[in-house]
Amino acid sequence: MNAGSPKPRAPACDRNRDPILAVLRGHFAGRRRVLEVGSGTGQHAVYFAGAMPWLEWQASDVAQNLPGIRAWLDDAGLANTPAPLALDVLQPWPEVDADAVFTANTLHIMGWNGVEAFFRGAGRVLSAAPGGMLAAYGPFNYGGGYTSDSNRDFDAWLRARDPQSGIRDFEAVDALASQAGLRLVDDVAMPANNRCLVWRVVSSASG
């Protein structure tokens, strides 16, 4: 991003940030550091870090998106937002000491191999974090069906654009989370036919 160029902006982030925050504020209350995977423009990182100052909010994304994220972080000047990390879910992840992972509107964009890699990576990050949490926001299908006509249309648009992308089945995603050592603790209906899914690390004591 060139000096003086406007920060990237996604209108959807302005619309969904408060409903997401209402979920995260409760589930991340006892957490200390969040790794956000796929921070996109950086809007969520700034908003959530400002609203939850007890958390260190570690933004990350593929390298080409980092300048825009830095622009948001630098403009906000928050003490709890370190420099964003380059993270491609299909490549080795950087070492991050985090006890929560968050992602928004990414699982339907990446291919299924990316979704699998995301849950493996998140599971590794959280494996040493007792009570670690993973939250994912976006559209999901249930029982093999769409939750709305608009989601059906959106899925068709996604697959026409990239056959590897598409709205994911909740059951398949939850199975990946389980394989990564996580158990679903919340599934919250959100505006515009989205969901916020929250998993917790399964402690060894609970088997």
Regions found by a protein language model. Name each.
Residues 1-29:
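Class I SAM-dependent methyltransferase Rossmann-like catalytic core
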Residues 182-207:
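Core SAM-dependent methyltransferase catalytic element
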Residues 164-180:
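Short alpha-helix
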Residues 35, 43-91:
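Class I SAM-dependent methyltransferase SAM/SAH-binding core
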Residues 93-101:
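A short acidic, Gly/Pro-enriched loop at the edge of an enzyme's catalytic core
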Residues 30-40:
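Conserved class I S-adenosyl-L-methionine
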Residues 110-122:
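A short, conserved alpha-helix within the catalytic core of class I
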Residues 129-141:
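Conserved beta-strand signature within the Rossmann-like core of class I S-adenosyl-L-methionine
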